[in-house]
Curated annotation (Swiss-Prot):
Residues 1-35 form a transit peptide. It is found in: Mitochondrion membrane. Involved in the biosynthesis of ascorbate. Catalyzes the final step of ascorbate biosynthesis. Uses L-galactono-1,4-lactone and L-gulono-1,4-lactone as substrates, but not D-galactono-1,4-lactone, D-gulono-1,4-lactone, L-mannono-1,4-lactone or D-galactonic acid. Also active with phenazine methosulfate and 1,4-benzoquinone as electron acceptors. Involved in the regulation of the accumulation of the mitochondrial respiratory complex I. Structural part of one of the plant-specific mitochondrial complex I assembly intermediates, lacking the whole distal (PD) module. The keyword Transit peptide applies. Disruption phenotype: Delayed germination, chlorotic cotyledons and death at the cotyledon stage. Binds FAD non-covalently. This is L-galactono-1,4-lactone dehydrogenase, mitochondrial. GO terms for cellular component: mitochondrial membrane; mitochondrion. Keywords: Membrane, Mitochondrion, Oxidoreductase, Transit peptide, Transmembrane, Transmembrane helix. It comes from Arabidopsis thaliana (Mouse-ear cress). PROSITE patterns: FAD_PCMH (PS51387). Pathway: Cofactor biosynthesis; L-ascorbate biosynthesis. Residues 43-58 have a biased composition (Pro residues).
Length: 610
């Protein structure tokens, strides 16, 4: 309405400016001519009286003022008229526009996002039961009413696999240790307990978990359902630590599963992606609490090839961190402290400050360079802590934020990171839950693929071939790929939905993760980084995954928007995993699919004729 009114006024004004010029056009009619009609002579009318002289013209500034004052008045009037012309019902007052105020969100609307801020939903149906009875009642009622309650853990999955706008259930309040069997080294816990919380609770019993992922804030239910893993070619993914579990299902109520009780469903549900039931309780096989010696040193791919078999077999835990656009490979091994020689006595050659200094120097140099390039831009280090106080990963984020999609700039940052690791070589001793953690950096996009790598006795070397091809791809396509490319290994899993599933006990699997950080809050820049990451991921998928039989980690897989790409992904998943068996179990345990979400439905489409 406002636009049409403005257009009318503009047209009228334009027409008005033409009226004076019309008086300058001479008419063909003259009062001094004689008009003849049927032989009669008509006397023309007397001339009109002279017009009064026009008022003196307004100055240009006065005319402009009146014009824009009129526009302003019209805009205000139109806005007020629009506002009062569309009343809202009482129950929708939060939607009403309020002058100079943001409309508040409803109090019952929950915003839930993953830790990287890459996936977010809002829902009014967010449930946190306090005990098993509450959970059972919630699942039963939701099943009867066909209300969705997708299980969600700590929200740490990079792809937000637990999120659903329709509704969620979170077990953060069900976080108790229920039983500890010190002799058998087993512990029974509620599934909402966090990994670090569990480790702290059982350390007085002399127990700990067999292996850990990079971080400790996951809920136990979530970490097993998505097939999370640590590293060590003799150690399986974390779902293999599950001895038995209690599953609250919509159709069959609470069922107990173990290797003895319905082993087929037990193995299927261990890594069940939250689609077969809400994991309420878990019994885990633990190990004696122990200290580890971590050895970090820098190598290169040529040297790694010579020692790879020994590195896999001789170390309890091992991982490689590759730094794109350099020859640097950071090798990290972890082994129990020797009972005879004790921890190593070697002291580091460099202090932490000395190790980080090269990165600090590059940051100082870079902010000067980018300030000169864009003098109107606020200095990146304004109103921020002194760079002497920043950790290496924080400095890396700030460096990348300056020009995250420039491959030359990213390569310089990677070279500085390689220098940091060269000066960080050495040993570290601590409890296993402290040593096996890893500072992953800030918010990020990540993709991790898993593929077979032979056996421990006879590695196929496909894992190193994969890395060689990946590094060539990065350099050929000038991908602004930051560090690290992380490579880890596990033994096989007996859970059919696990990417590391195998029926052969000796098989080992390699896990390779690529990354792009989101070191900025600027939405446009985050979108540009996101687009570049998905281009990076698409290239690796196209050129490497089929060649190496690689499949993505369930917590890192992303659903394609393109219909043909989605169909190709579904066909690929069906080739590797028992989709029909999984969907059959879903139909039996959750016929209304209240535990599902869009991601599960797209990955495991259920036939309507089944």
């Amino acid at each position: 309405m406002l636009r049409s009114l403005l257009l009318r006024r503009s047209v009228g004004h334009s027409l008005g400016t033409l009226s004076p010029s019309s008086s300058t056009i001479r008419s063909s009619f003259s009062p001094h001519r004689t008009l003849c009609t049927t032989g009669q002579t008509l006397t023309p009318p007397p001339p009109p009286p002279p017009r009064p002289p026009p008022p003196p013209p307004a100055t240009a500034s006065e005319a402009q003022f009146r014009k824009y004052a009129g526009y302003a008045a019209l805009a205000i009037f139109s806005g007020v008229a629009t506002y009062f012309s569309f009343p809202f019902p009482e129950n929708a007052k939060h939607k009403k526009a309020q002058i100079f105020r943001y409309a508040p969100l409803p109090e019952d609307l929950h915003t839930v996002s993953n830790w990287s801020g890459t996936h977010e939903v809002q829902t009014r149906n967010f449930n946190q039961p306090e005990n098993l009875a509450d959970l059972e009642a919630l699942v039963k009622e939701s099943h009867e009413k066909k209300l969705r309650i997708r299980p969600v853990g700590s929200g740490l999955s990079p792809n937000g696999i637990g999120l659903s706008r329709s509704g969620m259930v979170n077990l953060a309040l069900m976080d108790k240790v229920l039983e500890v069997d010190k002799e058998k080294k087993r512990v029974t816990v509620q599934a909402g307990i966090r990994v670090q919380q569990l480790v702290d609770a059982i350390k007085d019993y002399g127990l700990t978990l067999q292996n850990f992922a990079s971080i400790r804030e996951q809920q136990i239910g979530g970490i097993i359902q998505v097939g999370a893993h640590g590293t060590g070619a003799r150690l399986p993914p974390i779902d293999e630590q599950v001895i038995s579990m209690k599953l609250v299902t919509p159709a069959k109520g609470t069922i107990e599963l173990s290797r003895e009780k319905d082993p087929e469903l037990f193995h299927l549900a261990r890594c069940g992606l939250g689609g077969l039931g809400v994991v309420a309780e878990v019994t885990l096989q633990c190990v004696a609490r122990h200290e580890l010696v971590e050895h970090t040193y820098v190598s290169n791919l040529q040297e790694i090839k010579k020692n790879h078999k020994k590195l896999l077999s001789a170390n309890k835990h091992v991982k490689y961190l590759y730094i794109p656009y350099t020859d640097t490979v950071v090798v990290v091994t972890c082994n129990p402290v020797s009972k005879w020689s004790g921890p190593p006595k070697d002291k580091p050659k460099y202090t932490t400050d000395e190790a980080v200094q090269h990165v600090r120097d590059l940051y100082r140099e870079s902010i000067v360079k980018y300030r000169v390039q864009d003098s109107g831009k606020k200095s990146p280090d304004s109103s921020e802590p002194d760079i002497q106080e920043l950790s290496f990963t924080e400095l890396r984020d700030k460096l990348l934020a300056l020009d995250p999609l420039n491959d030359v700039h990213v390569a310089k940052v990677n070279q500085a990171e390689a220098e940091f690791w060269k000066k960080s070589e050495g040993y570290r001793v601590g409890w296993s839950d402290e040593i096996l953690g890893f500072d992953c950096g800030g918010q990020q996009w990540v993709s991790e693929s898993c593929f077979p790598a032979g056996t421990l006795a006879n590695p196929s070397m496909k894992d190193l071939e994969y890395i060689e091809e990946l590094k060539k791809l990065i350099e050929k396509e000038a991908i602004p790929a930051p560090a690290p490319i992380e490579q880890r290994w596990t033994a096989r899993s007996k859970s059919p939905i696990s990417p590391a599933f195998s029926t052969s006990e000796d098989d080992i699997f390699s896990w390779v993760g690529i990354i792009m950080y989101l070191p900025t809050a600027d939405p446009r820049q985050r979108k540009d980084i996101t687009d570049e990451f998905f281009h990076y991921r698409h290239l690796t998928q196209k050129q490497l995954w089929d060649q190496f039989s690689a499949y993505e980690h369930w917590a890192k897989i992303e659903i394609p928007k393109d219909k043909e790409e989605l169909e190709a992904l579904q066909a690929r998943i069906r080739k590797r995993f028992p989709v029909d068996a999984y969907n059959k179990a879903r139909r039996e345990l959750d016929p209304n699919r209240i535990l599902s979400n869009n991601m599960v439905e797209k990955l495991f489409p259920v036939s309507t004729t089944a």
